[in-house]
Each structure stands twice: as C-alpha cells, then as structure tokens.
Amino acid sequence: MFSKSGMSDLMKHAQRMQEQMQQMQGEIAKLEVNGESGAGLVKVTINGVYHCRRVEIDSSLLQDDKDMLEDLITAAFNDAVRRITEIKKDKMTSLSSSLQMPLGFNWNMPFL
C-alpha cells in the first residue's frame, strides 16, 4: 500500500496541514467584521467565531418603530455573518492551494 517513506511523508504533510489550519483558525477568531443595514444606520460588529462585539444604532432610529429597528439589527447581523463567511472561505481556498489538496476537495467543514 504505502512504503515507510511514503507513509512518513504523508504524516508530515498531515501534521503541517493541521498546524496551518490551527494558525488560520486563530487568525479568523481574532477578526472583527462590520455588517450594516439601513444605509449604515445600524451597524453590528462580530468576530470570527460569530460573537457579537458591538451594536451601533443611529439616534435618528430611536424614535422609529420598534419592529423596523429589530429588522435592521437582524439584517446588519446577517450581513456581518455573510462577510465573515466569505473571509473564511477565501482563507480556506488560499490554505488548500498552498497545501496542494486534491482537486475538488471540499472545505465545508462544520468546525470552521
């Protein structure tokens, strides 16, 4: 099946991949991304593990209807999640190309 040197090379490659993955996950966790809605009237900042760090609401909205404000906050949060997801996908694509993974390898892993 595998020669000893082939197995050793495979294990070294797997170890290197694991180290790079852990480093990337640490970098992603430190990221902060802003999501916006209502033309910037509501802003939500989340980190790379989707924890909400900050919510900013323009004072002009405080007199408006509660339902609309809730919708804008939800939309801003979802925008931030979309942005962080794109960043993660880009980083995984970059990592996979540097590791020479097989063509078509799927990085959609639940732990990312």
From Swiss-Prot:
It is found in: Cytoplasm, Nucleoid. Keywords: Cytoplasm, DNA-binding. InterPro entries: YbaB-like_sf, YbaB/EbfC. GO terms for molecular function: DNA binding. Transmembrane segments: none annotated. Belongs to the YbaB/EbfC family. Binds to DNA and alters its conformation. May be involved in regulation of gene expression, nucleoid organization and DNA protection. Homodimer. This is Nucleoid-associated protein BCI_0116. It comes from Baumannia cicadellinicola subsp. Homalodisca coagulata. The lineage of its organism: Bacteria, Pseudomonadati, Pseudomonadota, Gammaproteobacteria, Candidatus Palibaumannia.
